[in-house]
Amino acid sequence: MFIPKKTKYKKDFKGRISGNAKGGYTLSFGSHGLKALEPSRLTSKQIESARRSISRTLKRVGKVWIRAFCHTSVSKKPMDVRMGKGKGSVEMWVCKVKPGKILFEIGGVPLNLAREALNKAQAKLPMKCKFVSDEL
């Protein structure tokens, strides 16, 4: 899935997601895209689920670019373990998404098919998103 090959540190701080996206807020590769409207943490499973729904809708037509990648690890302690004794092991990888970030791009597809595919992908994501296009 979407996991970094190598990181400098194994475990990250939780941190906060504040402000708007400083980069990645315009369409770069395709002509249609899905833009985040609120801050959230995307897991690698959610990104993969959205990608699958897009590719099923497009049926081998056009190309899909994924603009979000999971860089942040989330740790969790096992059930029935008392507090203390260090930080838990890495449970999953997430991508911190700020408002305005383009998550997915599609190229070589008609407008109505791209809108349908990205609306299905939006249902798999934990935040509000909107459809953006060069043609509009």
UniProtKB/Swiss-Prot annotation:
Domain of life: Bacteria
PANTHER family for the chain: 50S/60S RIBOSOMAL PROTEIN L16 (PTHR12220), LARGE RIBOSOMAL SUBUNIT PROTEIN UL16M (PTHR12220:SF13)
Assembly information from the UniProt record: Part of the 50S ribosomal subunit.
InterPro entries associated with the record: Ribosomal_uL16, Ribosomal_uL16_bact-type, Ribosomal_uL16_CS, Ribosomal_uL16_dom, Ribosomal_uL16_sf
Sorted UniProt keywords: Ribonucleoprotein, Ribosomal protein, RNA-binding, rRNA-binding, tRNA-binding
Organism: Ehrlichia chaffeensis (strain ATCC CRL-10679 / Arkansas)
GO biological process terms on file: translation
Summary of the function given for this chain in its UniProt record: Binds 23S rRNA and is also seen to make contacts with the A and possibly P site tRNAs.
The gene coding this protein: rplP
GO molecular function: rRNA binding; structural constituent of ribosome; tRNA binding
Entry's Gene Ontology cellular component terms: cytosolic large ribosomal subunit
Sequence similarity: Belongs to the universal ribosomal protein uL16 family.
Keyword Lyase on entry: no
Protein's UniProt keywords contain RNA-binding: yes
Pfam families: Ribosomal_L16
Protein name: Large ribosomal subunit protein uL16
